[in-house]
Design a protein with these regions (language model features):
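Short glycine-rich His-centered loop
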Residues: 1-23
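Active-site-proximal helix/loop segments of hydrolytic enzymes
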Residues: 24-188
Length: 188
């Protein structure tokens, strides 16, 4: 999702209600998390690829094409897609595509670490197929050649999650957990 350019949010919808901290734009939140992950990976000298660095709303097709080009050159990569949710729920949830794939193991590791690290945060697990993730054929999960995992870091339209998504400690803990998972996936 897009960021804020000259005070204008680049993606229709994808925002919280205008509560006490103001409107939380999903694209803005996503960038907070991704940029902190990038900083930590840089400091640890861990290589990564960023398939959506623009502040404009980059299409799913463009992001997928970029990911597929990277995968052609480096088939060891996987996709971590960061989001903030909406729809009246609460908590963290993660998604992989339908069926048992490499992404299920990655997603289960990420969600296990988040459960351990995000003390007191509701986790929305789906154990119906033996792992924690939910399965949906979202474009960014189904179309790339690389394994892909999508994480929803909380619900922008739930008061507790809204406050968490603005909270520095919550974001730092989330980022530390995601970086730990990246390191574990790559066995670094």
């Amino acid at each position: 999702h897009g960021g804020v350019i000259n005070g204008i949010y680049q993606t229709p919808g994808k925002r919280s209600p205008n509560w006490d901290k103001g409107v939380l734009f999903e694209g803005m939140f996503n960038r907070w998390v991704v940029n902190r992950i990038i900083e930590k990976l840089d400091r640890k000298k861990i290589p990564y690829y960023h398939i959506s660095p623009e502040f404009t709303d980059t299409t799913l097709e463009t992001r997928t094409n970029r990911a597929n080009h990277i995968f052609d050159q480096n088939p060891d990569v996987w996709i971590l897609s960061i989001h903030a949710n909406a729809g009246g729920g609460t908590g963290i949830e993660g998604f992989t595509t339908l069926g048992q794939k490499t992404s299920d193991g990655i997603g289960d590791l990420v969600l296990r670490n988040l459960k351990d690290d995000m003390i007191g945060t509701s986790m929305r697990f789906d154990w119906s197929d033996g792992d924690r993730d939910k399965e949906k054929d979202y474009y960014i999960l189904k179309r790339p050649m690389a394994p892909a995992f999508l994480i929803e870091c909380g619900f922008m339209d739930h008061p507790i999650d809204y406050n968490n998504l603005w909270d520095e400690i919550y974001i730092d803990t989330l980022v530390d957990s995601l970086v730990r998972s990246i390191i574990e996936v790559y066995n670094i």
